C-alpha cells in the first residue's frame, strides 16, 4: 500500500489545508477521531475510500486532490477527499514502517512538465527571457518552496508535481511551477546541497556580461533619478510641488520604460511621502522619507556593482535584475486566498482619512495590504474603524481571518478586490492562527529578530513587493509602562523570548485618527487575568533601541486590533521608561535630525548653518 501512493504520505495537515481549506481538515480529523473511518481499497491504479453512508471517493494515480472523483456531489474540493488521504496515511502508518526520507530530485518532473500545454511553457520562457530571479528554499525537514517576484510556489510532495501549489489564479501546473522546477534543477546541478539560494534564470537573451546602464534607456533612468535627488536635496521637499513635479515624472517614466519595477515603486513611495508631508498626514514619517530617498540612489548604485561583478565572472550576492525588479508585472491574479490579519493603521490628512490593513497568507508567508480612504468631511460620523469594506466592518477585518476569491495582488503587495469579489467569510483572529505562521514573520523572541535583521540584505536591494519590517513576537511579561507627554507616546518594556538582552521596547504614538489605541494598549499590558502573549507590529530603531510599534495584541482568548478601539478605555500611567541613549547614539540621532532638516528645507537655504552643526 505504501508503494502505491507515496506522495499522499507526504501531505501534512498544513499541506492539506493549503490544498483544500482549514474547515475541511478540521472536520475530517474530528470525524476520523469519532470513528467515521472509510474503507480503503485500490483497483486499476486508483485509491478508493468507501464511507458508511455510501459515499465513494476515488483518486487515480497521477491525479491532484481536487481532481479526485466523489459521489457526494460537491463542486470542487470536499471533506471526503481530505479524509481519503488522512485515512490512507493512518492505514500505512499501522501496516508499514516509515522509510528514510530520500534526497529530493526535482529533475524527475522535467519530462512531465514538457507535456504541459504550449501556452503554459511559452509563458514560462517569456519570463526566463526577462532574466527572472527566483528565491529557493530547501531546508531539511521543511517544504521546498520558490518565491517568484509575483508568485509563491510550494512543493507539498517530493514525489508528485501534482501536489505543487502556486498562489496564482491557476493554482497548480502553471508557468510559475515550471520555472520553480527548472530553477531547482539548475541550482542543484551547480550546488547540490543548499538551504537558501537566489537563482537567476538565463536564456540566449540574457547574457552574463550585460550592463543595466549600457543602454540609452538605462542610462537615462539613472540620470533622471540623480537629477531628482539633487533637486530635492538642494531645494527641500517643503518647496512648492511645481519645483520638482517634472523631475518626478521624468524619473518615473524612465523607470517604467526600462521596466524596472522596484525603481518605479521606490519613486512612487518617495512621492507618496512627499505628498503626505505637504498634506500634513498623520502617517508621515520624516525618517522613512529620508530612508526612501537614500535607498533610491543606492539601489541603482548596487545594480551597477552587481553587474560589474557578474561581468568579471564573480557571482554577485544578488543579480542586478533582482535589485531593480526587471520585468516584474504590475499585477497578478491570485487563487483562493485564506488570509490572517496582522493589524490595521488609521490615518488622516487635511483632505482625506483612511486605513490600511495588513494580512498574511499562512500557506506562503507573503504579506498583503488592503487600503481605503474617504473624504475628511465624513470622518466625524463614520470613523475609519467603523467603515464597512465588502459588507464587513473594518475593525472586524483587522482582528480576523478572511477568505477571498479571485483577488489580485499589485507589485507593491496591495490586495485588489473589485466590488463583486465579496469576502466569503470572516472569523475572529485566534492565537492558533498566529501559531501556524513561521519565520521570518513570526520570531521566537527579540534576540532571534536582532540576528535575522543583522543577516538580511540591505534595504536598498530588497524587493518592494511587501512590507519587510512587520513581525510577530511573543510577550512573556511587562516590566515597565509609561506615557511620555513630551513625545505623546506610550512606551513599554516587555520580556520577549529566551536569552540575554531579551527586553523588547513597545512604543505607540498618539494619533487623532485612532485616539483610544494607546489606552487599549496600556490596559492590555496591565491586565493579569488574560495577559498579552503575542504582539504584531512594525520594527524600527528609535534612539538606538530596536522598537516595535504595536498593531495587534493577542491574549490567550482573543486578538485586539489597537486602532479599532472607538471608545475610551482607561487613564494612562505617566512615567518615563526608556533608557537614556548612549553618547554614540545621541550623535547618530543628531546626525539624522540634521539630514531630515536638510531634506525638509533644502541645502541651498541652510548650507552654512548645516556645516556648522555638522
From Swiss-Prot:
GO terms for cellular component: cytosol. Keywords: Metal-binding, Repeat, Zinc, Zinc-finger. InterPro entries: Znf_SWIM (IPR007527). A zinc finger (SWIM-type) spans 55-89, 151-185. GO terms for molecular function: zinc ion binding. Missing up to 60 C-terminal residues compared to orthologs. This is Protein YehQ. It comes from Escherichia coli (strain K12).
